[in-house]
Design a protein with these regions (language model features):
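Conserved Class I SAM-dependent methyltransferase catalytic core
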Residues: 50-52, 56, 60-65, 69, ...
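Residues immediately flanking
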Residues: 86, 102, 138-139
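Conserved S-adenosyl-L-methionine
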Residues: 1-90, 106-107, 111-113
Length: 189
């Protein structure tokens, strides 16, 4: 769901725009009010926004579910999903960010493999030194295995399970003025 939510934010798409709610059947709010609200939310979507949202997983069944959910959200043409091991992650982009919810290793038998995954993430992500990373996990020693202390850490709950959002901030990309943007647009043609 992270790539789907990222695309919705990038397109300025209201959450739940494609869903129905019990409140839509309340007698004291007419159907017209809900229709008008949906129409207004739809008019605010930026359909031509340039997005580069990608989702990776080593589990093909997880990717299949993600593709189905992207289609249900009307975003199948805005997202790219691919089966890929974390070891293969790279990018030519100088700036970007990664939001990930890796396995937590809640079962004792998974603990060692998850800790190995966190070490591998630390190695791979360190090569993307101008990127920012946002990692959600319940593992209390995540930073030790990742090899770096987070710039910020926020407590979250995934249902009843306490997790933490570890935030690692990269540098901000340089600002481009309108002249540079126009120049780049000409070069890209």
């Amino acid at each position: 769901t992270i790539p789907i939510e990222a695309a919705m934010i990038g397109l300025n798409m209201a959450p739940g725009i494609n869903r129905s709610f019990v409140s839509g059947n309340w007698r004291w709010i007419t159907k017209n009010v809900w229709d008008k609200a949906r129409e207004e939310a739809g008019s605010l979507i930026i359909n031509d926004a340039e997005l580069n949202v990608q989702g990776y997983d080593i589990d093909e069944s997880a990717l299949k579910v993600a593709r189905i959910n992207a289609k249900l959200a009307g975003l199948e043409n805005k997202l790219h999903f691919q089966k890929r091991d974390i070891k293969e992650l790279s990018s030519k982009d100088h700036y970007g960010f990664i939001v990930t919810n890796p396995p937590y290793g809640e079962r004792l038998s998974d603990q060692k493999s998850v800790e190995g995954l966190y070490k591998e993430m630390g190695k791979v992500f360190s090569k993307l030194d101008t990127w920012s990373f946002y990692i959600i996990t319940s593992h209390e020693e995540f930073e030790r295995f990742f090899g770096r202390r987070a710039d910020k850490k926020r407590k979250l709950y995934n249902g009843m399970m306490r997790t933490d959002l570890y935030q690692f901030f990269g540098p901000k990309p340089p600002k481009r003025n309108n002249y540079e943007s126009a120049e780049l647009s000409e070069i890209e043609k």
